[in-house]
Curated annotation (Swiss-Prot):
Family: Belongs to the universal ribosomal protein uL29 family.
Keywords, sorted A to Z: Ribonucleoprotein, Ribosomal protein
SUPFAM superfamilies per record: Ribosomal protein L29 (L29p)
Protein name: Large ribosomal subunit protein uL29
GN (gene name): rpl29
Top-level taxon: Archaea
Pfam families per the UniProt record, alphabetical: Ribosomal_L29
GO molecular function, one term: structural constituent of ribosome
Keyword Ribosomal protein: yes
């Protein structure tokens, strides 16, 4: 999966951004749990990509005046 671009994020509605944010946070939680339980992650760089996407979404929501 590729990174979500700011242009794409700004075109989303607030509900879409919040849904995507919850989706990514859940995926990050699952990956972190897998790593901590001793499992091997298929793509370790995916964790950093998800973290950056979450930050982009939160920044876009803050720009709209929505507190996350």
């Amino acid at each position: 999966m590729k990174a979500v671009k700011m242009k794409e994020i700004r075109e989303m509605s607030r509900e879409e951004k919040l849904r995507k944010l919850r989706e990514l946070e859940l995926e990050l939680l699952k990956l972190r749990t897998l790593v901590r339980s001793g499992g091997a992650v298929e793509n370790p760089g995916r964790i950093n990509l998800i973290r950056k996407d979450i930050a982009r979404l939160k920044m876009a929501l803050c720009e709209e005046g929505y507190r996350v």
